[in-house]
UniProtKB/Swiss-Prot annotation:
This is Putative homeobox protein R749. GO terms for cellular component: host cell nucleus. It comes from Acanthamoeba polyphaga mimivirus. Residues 161-220 bind DNA. Signal peptide: none annotated. It is found in: Host nucleus. GO terms for biological process: regulation of transcription by RNA polymerase II. GO terms for molecular function: RNA polymerase II cis-regulatory region sequence-specific DNA binding. The lineage of its organism: Viruses, Varidnaviria, Bamfordvirae, Nucleocytoviricota, Megaviricetes.
Length: 224
């Protein structure tokens, strides 16, 4: 309100001063003698200045909320690279073909549930010298209640491990020896035919030929 009153007062004083100065200037021009031939035009009185509009009150500025200080960013620690152990390429080349067999072996072991809790299955899996996988052999091992029973009871071989010796008659032996004289390494087809003739399995015929070759080799080395 004080600012508005001051503005009104200044505008009124300024207006009166302008009007008085303009009237004084008109009187001086009219009273002065001009020697020139051109008539002096009368100066029109100055129109009063319009009053200045009052300045609108400035709205109060809202108080600015204090800004919280920004927390400093912690430096990110570098991640240590994970070191992968080196694999021997030769060993890795042998392990690649064995992956399906190992998976099948573990799946089969999960499915097997022993009926007798006193019987444990011992799986024997070996690798041959050339890197091939040997078929695992399941052996049953009975848990003994005392160590004395282990010493007294000898271990017996299962029927699968026992080698059955097959005795051949003279006629069957003559058939195999006649073929051996012709070819001591018969093909699978010939072994099947011989097995049908003598009433044996092809595997038994193959074992007979192997034993016969081994026996002849030993006799030859002994004579030399």
């Amino acid at each position: 309100m004080d600012l508005q009153k001051a503005c009104d007062r200044i505008s009124q004083e300024f207006e009166t001063d302008i009007i008085m100065g303009a009237n004084l200037l008109v009187q001086m021009i009219q009273s002065q003698r001009i020697t020139s031939n051109t008539p002096v035009q009368t100066v029109q009185p100055v129109q009063p200045v319009q009053p200045v509009q009052s300045v609108q009150s400035v709205q109060s500025v809202q108080s600015v909320q204090s800004v919280q200080p920004v927390q400093p960013v912690q430096p990110v620690q570098p991640v240590q690279p994970v070191r992968v152990p080196e694999i021997n390429p030769v060993l890795f080349s042998y392990l690649i073909p064995l992956i399906p067999f190992i998976q099948m072996y573990h799946i089969a072991q999960k499915d097997v549930v022993p009926k007798n809790p006193q019987v444990q299955k011992q799986d024997v899996s070996q690798f041959t010298p050339d890197g091939k996988f040997k078929i695992p052999i399941n052996k049953t091992k009975t848990i003994k209640k005392s160590t004395s029973e282990k010493k007294t009871s000898p271990k017996k071989k299962t029927t699968s491990q026992q080698i059955k010796r097959v005795r051949l008659s003279d006629e069957e032996r003559n058939i195999l020896e006649s073929q051996y004289s012709k070819n001591n390494f018969p093909s699978p087809e010939i072994r099947d035919e011989l097995a049908k003739k003598i009433g044996k399995t092809p595997r038994q015929v193959q074992i007979w030929f192997q034993n016969k070759r081994c026996k002849d080799r030993k006799n030859l080395e002994k004579n030399n």
